[in-house]
Amino acid sequence: MANRSTFLSAGVFTREFDLSFLPEVIPAVGAAVIGPTVRGPALVPTPVSTYSEYLRWFGDVFSSGSGASEKEYKYLTTYAVQEYLRWGEVITVVRILAGQYRPAYSFVRSKAGKDANSYAQNQMSFKITALSDGEITNSGRTTAALSGSGKTTDESTQGSLVSGSRYNMRWEVANVDNNRGTFDLYIRRGDDSDFRKIIMEQYVGVTLDPNASNYITKVIGNQTYALRYDSGGTPYLQLTGSYPNRSRFIRVDVIKNTLNYINNDGTVRDGDLSGSLPAAFSASVPTAFSGTFAFGSDGSVAHPRAMYGDIWNNNSQGFNLAVSTYSTPYLDAIDILSNKDQYDYDLLLTPGLIDNLQDHAKVITRAISMVEDRGDAFYIIDPTYKGSTVGQAQIAAEGRNTNYAGYYYPWVQIVDADLGGNYWVPPSAIVPSVYSFNDLVAEKWYAPAGLNRGGLDQAIQTERLMTQNDRDNLYIKNINPIATFPRTGVVVWGQKTLQKKKSALDRINVRRLLIAAKRHVANTAKYLVFEQNTIETRTKFINITTPWFENARK
């Protein structure tokens, strides 16, 4: 074939350049929600793409109260996630806990310390810590308190835990091999029994030798995020630990290593190293033994929790926002989500925060400032507590002026099949489904409202049946009514932002159009950063961005 890199005779030659190339497809952008959950890591933004994945990480139903007053509930966070993920692709969950919260943990005794009554670390082989913070993962009163039978003192005679539940867990060690320095570790569900084990994870043939490929910390992981503050008081997450977590439930820290346990010829290098292995019992005692998790704490969460329509200034799902101990976690979560490089979302939700409750409003103000500073997210706010009038909603709206947030009124009643009843929830717990449905069937610059895209099919009824005059009075103050119409049901009937000045940006679809446009330009142009400022680079940028804007114009 002729070489066409040089041309000796006259002629017209063409050369082709692909100026539309992008290395990867831009990932989906979803919502972010801040609020309490049943379990999960606290203050660590965690993306989930399905509701079942959310349940695995954060749970759903919990009980509060005691005796005849004990009831089962769901946090409003759960409803918001469930509604958004009906049509949406991903939502980032930030769990809130207050005060000195901590995860449950357990020590596994070493062979040398199995008969000791002490919990000194020199008696322990390794420590297992739950990835989930809070007391929900406590399955016993102590950790690895062994009785003479190799069972924990928290077990019944049938091998089930007195405090076992589907939300907590227990561990079991089996098949300790002194010749190889290996053992098996099983993570079991807290409500199983020795006769009907529910094994959630199993790690076979792990070792305490840090040079081995099956070193237990390498296999399971030991990383966690610690909340830190910089010199200016801004919170950030500091990663600790050397090995990524492969377990969905635990992390492991080895206390007694067995360095180079096996020689090259397959023999045990030092017989004393076997004393570091998990305790093995005599022939008259089972070779498998188990333990429970304890000492997990929810911190300063108030009991009983005020739920649903009982939410008030000093108790919103167990959080008294009049006290800094409770408000600070919300503020920390908001500040953490301000990191645009790390967390990508275009819709912010804080179900449980009510704007006409004084101390809630302070937190909401911080959240508004955060989305305005980011410039790429819209914030759904609940203006009033249950039972508030149209006039009270109007008063709340007078104190806000932003095109990065919107109000919806009134509260809505939904059916909860898991709890077997009807419950009142604020708009931010159900309206997210309208946004995700709108984005699925249309585009972000379409109005998330009306009979075609604004239906709330999960809703039974609204707290108040509004007249045309009520809707007009709300809309004048930039509050989006949730209306009820015969034969059509409950519908979002407005799409205004909280901007007071009349302009195109007092409409939610226009604000979301600009958010989407800025995100598209930013995500595509970053591949051209540090490229030469040439006509080819500029042409590439135009070719990348123009089709998106042409589509938005249609």
Q: Which residues make up each language-model segment?
A:
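Short, cationic low-complexity segments
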Residues: 204-219
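Intrinsically disordered, low-complexity regulatory segments in eukaryotic proteins
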Residues: 153-178, 333-339
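Negatively charged, low-complexity tracts enriched in Asp/Glu with abundant Ser/Thr
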Residues: 143-150
